[in-house]
Amino acid sequence: ENVSLIGSEENLKNFKPESLVNYYKTWYRPDMQSVVVVGDVDADAVVAKIKDLFGQLPKAENPKAKEPVVVPDNATPIVSIFTHKENQQTSVLFAVKSPAIPKQFRGLGVAMLNDLVEWLMSSMINERLQDISRTPDAPFLQANASFGDVSNDLHAFMGAVATKDGEALKGFKGLVTELERVKRYGFTPDEFERAKAKILKSYETAKNNAA
């Protein structure tokens, strides 16, 4: 299936300005926006300035409610093939869906523990995939795996491989084979210690930057 990365050319050439204005008024309203300030600043002064600049923005009248994004379940894999003339590399991506942690538990210990476990697993898997990509007979040019929320109610384990032209299936099999190895045999103590060290270092860096 041929797709455009920026949408319909006809729509871009012929849309009416009112379409943009209506979209802005519908979704870019005060109750759906935030102001983020980063830096070494006088917090009280910045808050006062923000209130001065944005405090008088009127609330939207009859605001349109956000409809939840519902991704339907599927018993068999959903497969799509996309091509684009400007894409110079073959890649395969997949996602395994699961329910997201309910909002009321996010920020609690159980959710933080889950995030930490996923972070450790991603780090260890990606280290392996990187090592494989450096071998002379690697099945892919590069590969990675990660966990993340797809929507408010949906979580997913995601993987991706980039391959030489004509080797998409070979690369995909290489990634899935390594994931199956992890499923069956887990990780080594050395892999775990390296992943733990990376995470601790990132926390230390974040702490120092916040000081």
What are these regions (language model features)?
Residues Y23, A45-V46, P58, P102-F105, ...:
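Short helix/loop capping segments that flank catalytic or ligand/cofactor-binding pockets
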Residues S34-L93, A197-K207:
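An aromatic/glycine/proline-enriched structural segment found at the starts
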Residues N114, E118-S122:
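Long, His/Glu/Asp-enriched segments that create or flank divalent metal/ion-associated functional microenvironments
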Residues N126:
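Active-site and adjacent loop segments of nucleotide-processing enzymes
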